[in-house]
Curated annotation (Swiss-Prot):
It is found in: Plastid, Chloroplast. Keywords: Chloroplast, Plastid, Ribonucleoprotein, Ribosomal protein. The keyword Ribosomal protein applies. Belongs to the bacterial ribosomal protein bL32 family. It comes from Porphyra purpurea (Red seaweed). This is Large ribosomal subunit protein bL32c. GO terms for cellular component: chloroplast; large ribosomal subunit.
Amino acid sequence: MAVPKKRTSKAKKNARKANWKNQAKTEAQKALSLAKSVLTGKSNGFVYNTLEVADAIVE
């Protein structure tokens, strides 16, 4: 079984964690932007029944 030989430094650990958090932040911003676009009706890349969407928003 593979075992690390030395302890990972704090700097490397923090850099990896910061990278992971930045990726998550970017994905969250994309999801929020997409949701806003769909709700305002300005998105052209989706094909859906507008009555179903309106009913879902009202409920």
